[in-house]
UniProtKB/Swiss-Prot annotation:
Similarity remark: Belongs to the LpxH family.
Broad class of where this protein is predominantly found: membrane
Name of the protein in its database record: UDP-2,3-diacylglucosamine hydrolase
A cellular component term, taken from the record's GO annotations: cytoplasm
Highest taxon of source: Bacteria
Amino acid sequence: MTTLIISDLHLDPLRPVVTELFLRFLREQVSGADALYILGDLFEIWIGDDMPSEVADMVVAALRTHADAGTPLYFMPGNRDFLVGADYAARAGFRILPDPCVVDLYGEPTLLLHGDLLCTDDIAYQAFRAQTRDPEFIAQFLTQTLSARLAFAQQARLASHAHQSGLKQENDSTQFEKITDVVPADVAAMFACYGVNRMIHGHTHRPALHMLQVAECACTRVVLGDWYQQGSVLCVDADGLVLEQLLLPG
């Protein structure tokens, strides 16, 4: 049996082919799995569980089918969908995980994160993250009208794109990659803090398996891929793990 781990699908009505691929993945691969973990950014935008969305409705129905069949489903919020709450979780049948958290995968304690916590060289993003994850901010935000929340989210997305463009203009390609990737010292500190030898995260859209030494321990950091040009899934079992790509329909 296998545990499947994915992230960064960024499901959006403007990219129906990705939603189609995800639904096919659920039908064809999740039914026989030990568990499914979604490590954030399942959706491109999420402004509250009361947000009307045909894509979210299709996803919740598909996930519920597997939950009802007994497949454990887990969701860790990302930077795009950190407002996914208890109502949607109950409808879909998944458990919301804290970021970060340690889970046991076939006897191997494994640290799961969305991944943005490790990108501390991007100071502006970390400041925005701290503001928007504040419980008081979230409570106040969710009292606003849907239209006001949507306007804020759209503006935040435009600001994010502008920030990324600015970083590209102000830095050479090597420095830009460094700023927008994880900070090695933070990775090492996270390994040491949680006392594990394996870490899995998404966010950076740079799928890879990294081997490193932390305090004389051999550690593995697995980076999940995004679902833009193809799908990406990490398959974990008692024998190890494999990163696989999924072809988009058509």
